[in-house]
């Protein structure tokens, strides 16, 4: 690929057997640090799930090493160009699961998973009338961007998805089911779970939203908004043909694509809000969070009690 920016962000996963995740994680962290990469990599007995950033040279060395390891034969790297690192630190952590579903009887994607659809086939399938599109991500990811007509499960974490499906099965019965997520890893298990639950026509977007947005044929069409990513960038564009903002400011409902975390560390909820409203509402999602003694916005900006009281009074006056 033609390189125009000095850094890259890699996104990848692979379901493969890693005998000793703890030992592998420690060695892999050392290796990543030697390359001066930064990122977040999860390792489990069932495989690896990672995203990391570095210079073109550093990421090339990393991909070469991974490709030379027989355990990762065939691994696919999704590559974004960047002006700098997308992470502050490098973490490699062992986990019981790569994606947290916590099923009593786990899904092995090598044994059972939904049909893979390439971007063009997924695009065509979305336009069919008897199709249901399920977003397999969390609610705050959906709120920033999603496929047109996709169903938003009312969940805050991936492990809540099976229960939501069981409670809303009438929406899916007799339909062709399409499911998608950021890079594809969640759908490997989720689509397999749907098949095991008895749904007969289940397909997943191969490579996820990130691959769909880069596809030269579909060019991200039928996607509205941006794609939430778990690094310093927060959001990346998908639709190359038109940019429709679907995110709404938490306080005013105006179009917004800027995420912040609630300033109350005990809440930490992700909210969409403008810089202006961040200052006006002390970056807090509610009155309770605004008056929290641990409000990070108040502490960071060294606001006095009088200044906080004035801000609260202004909010009250504006209601």
Curated annotation (Swiss-Prot):
Gene3D superfamilies in alphabetical order: 3.30.70.100, Rhodanese-like domain (3.40.250.10)
SMART domains the UniProt entry points to: RHOD (SM00450)
Keyword annotations: Oxidoreductase, tRNA processing
Membrane-spanning segments: none
One GO process term, biological-process aspect: tRNA modification
EC number, UniProt record: 1.14.-.-
GO molecular function: oxidoreductase activity, acting on paired donors, with incorporation or reduction of molecular oxygen
Catalytic activity entry: uridine(34) in tRNA + AH2 + O2 = 5-hydroxyuridine(34) in tRNA + A + H2O
Active site: 181 (cysteine persulfide intermediate)
Domain named Rhodanese: residues: 127-221
The keyword Zinc-finger appears for this protein: no
Keyword Membrane among record annotations: no
Source species, domain of life: Bacteria
InterPro entries the record matches: Rhodanese-like_dom, Rhodanese-like_dom_sf, Rhodanese_C, TrhO, TRHO_N
CDD domains according to UniProt: RHOD_YceA (cd01518)
Function recorded in the entry: Catalyzes oxygen-dependent 5-hydroxyuridine (ho5U) modification at position 34 in tRNAs.
Membership in a protein family: Belongs to the TrhO family.
HAMAP family assigned to the protein according to its UniProt record, in alphabetical order: TrhO (MF_00469)
Protein name as it appears in the record: tRNA uridine(34) hydroxylase
Organism whose genome encodes this protein: Bacillus cereus (strain ATCC 14579 / DSM 31 / CCUG 7414 / JCM 2152 / NBRC 15305 / NCIMB 9373 / NCTC 2599 / NRRL B-3711)
Originating gene: trhO
